[in-house]
Structure formats: structure tokens, C-alpha cells
């Protein structure tokens, strides 16, 4: 049986494989544009970066990791940023992918959905399922940022301190990673990569403005076709977490 780290690394590689095949099809059909290729390139690089980060010892791959970071910076300029929330660090991480991925190795509960004034797309809010049982304050937000091609941005806030048990699937153990073969969507694990770079200061400023515009009374969990019935309703006290974020300098 694979460990949690092994499964996460394999899932990252499989996701990179899927995006690599999508990029290959674009190249074969000569349908190249920055809008269609940048999200794929960004996801591929971060998938490998995430998988390599689990290799022990890290000192074996200083050149490769540095190269990946340099290549990623050409695709999307980013900067590290950490803020403090109470006694613990509150870190912001971002992932962009062609589809929303509700399963990223952790269990989440949807507790809010909001139409943002500065965007035509709604933003969904989640908390760790073990927020109350294990005092885990990890949160994430999912929002479509463009529709052609579709790109979904997932922003993670805080760190998981829960002891979530990953679901084992023997499919991973027998899967040979070959980059000239397409893995079906039903086989590919749904992973939202979390690399070690914080979101850009520009996105942080946008998030700050959006949070200020969000009235607690406007939050609702509606019958969205994609998210409906996947998560139970939220309690109003949970949104205070994001209200406190908006007040941070």
C-alpha cells in the first residue's frame, strides 16, 4: 500500500501526464495560443515540481528544482508572501487548472458561494471537514477566471493540521506512467497542486478587495449544477475567518 506522500506524488505525475497529452494535441492540431497553452504548461511544471519535492534527500535535485522554478517564473510571474493570523502562519497558495478539482487529497465542506463584483464568475468557499473535530483551519476558494479555454483558480489559505486518511486505490499501483498515452479522466486522480510559491501580490490585493466587497448576508449555497449536493450548508460563524483576512495589512 502506498503512503500518502507516494499517492500524492503519483497523482501529481499523472496530472502532468494528462496536461502534457493535451498540449501534444494542441501542437498536432496547430491550435496554439498563450491562452490555451499557458495553463497547461503551468500545471505540467508544477506537477513535476510537486512530485520532485517528495524525493529525499532534497539535495539530490538542486539543479532540477531550480530549473523548474525558473521555467515556471517565465510562464507566470509570482512572488512569495506570508501573513500572520493570530498565533499561526496563514499562507496563501494558488493553483490554476482547466477543470475544478474538488478532490485534492483532503476532504472539504462547501460553506459559501458568492457573486463577486469584480468578476462575472462565482467564487465557492470551502473549509476542511475536520475544522471542528481536529481544529484544522485550512480553507480554500475556487473560482473560474476565464471560460475560453476554461481556467479555474484554487486559492488555499492556511495549513492542514488534521490527520486525514487518504483513500487507497490499487489503480495507482499498476499504472505505468507513459507520456505518449492518454489516461482517461476516470483513472486520473483529481489533484489540485500546491507548490511552495505563495500567490502574487497582485492576486493578494485583488483577493483583499473582493473580501471587502463580500457581505456576510450575501453568502449562499445554491443549487449550482456542478457543486449541488456535494457539501452540506455552512454556518455563518465560519465566514468570520475570511472577514479577518480582509482586515490584515
Swiss-Prot record:
DNA-binding region(s) from the entry: 97-165
GO terms, molecular function: DNA-binding transcription factor activity; sequence-specific DNA binding
InterPro entries: WRKY_dom, WRKY_dom_sf, WRKY_plant
Entry keywords, A to Z: DNA-binding, Nucleus, Transcription, Transcription regulation
Keyword Zinc set for record: no
Primary localization: nucleus
Entry protein name: Probable WRKY transcription factor 64
Organism this protein belongs to: Arabidopsis thaliana (Mouse-ear cress)
Amino acid at each position: 500500500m502506498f503512503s500518502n506522500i507516494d499517492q500524492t506524488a503519483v497523482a501529481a505525475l499523472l496530472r502532468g501526464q494528462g496536461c502534457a497529452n493535451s498540449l501534444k494535441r494542441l501542437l498536432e492540431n496547430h491550435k496554439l495560443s498563450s491562452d490555451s497553452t499557458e495553463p497547461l504548461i503551468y500545471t505540467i511544471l508544477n506537477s513535476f515540481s510537486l512530485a520532485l519535492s517528495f524525493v529525499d534527500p532534497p539535495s539530490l535535485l538542486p539543479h532540477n528544482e531550480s530549473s523548474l522554478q525558473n521555467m515556471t517564473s517565465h510562464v507566470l510571474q509570482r512572488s512569495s508572501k506570508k501573513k500572520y493570523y493570530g498565533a499561526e502562519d496563514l499562507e496563501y497558495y494558488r493553483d490554476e487548472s482547466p477543470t475544478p478539482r474538488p478532490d485534492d487529497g483532503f476532504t472539504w465542506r462547501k460553506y459559501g458561494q458568492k457573486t463577486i463584483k469584480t468578476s462575472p464568475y462565482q467564487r465557492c468557499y470551502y473549509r476542511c471537514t475536520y475544522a471542528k473535530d481536529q481544529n484544522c483551519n485550512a480553507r480554500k476558494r475556487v473560482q473560474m477566471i476565464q471560460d475560453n479555454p476554461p481556467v479555474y483558480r484554487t486559492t488555499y489559505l492556511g495549513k492542514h493540521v488534521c490527520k486525514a486518511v487518504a483513500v487507497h486505490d490499487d489503480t495507482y499501483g499498476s499504472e505505468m506512467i507513459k507520456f505518449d498515452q492518454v489516461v482517461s479522466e476516470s483513472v486520473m486522480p483529481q489533484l489540485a497542486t500546491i507548490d511552495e510559491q505563495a500567490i502574487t501580490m497582485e492576486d493578494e490585493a485583488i483577493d483583499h478587495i473582493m473580501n471587502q466587497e463580500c457581505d456576510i448576508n450575501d453568502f449562499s449555497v445554491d443549487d449550482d449544477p456542478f457543486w449541488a449536493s456535494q457539501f452540506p450548508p455552512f454556518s455563518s460563524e465560519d465566514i468570520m475567518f475570511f472577514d479577518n483576512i480582509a482586515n490584515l495589512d
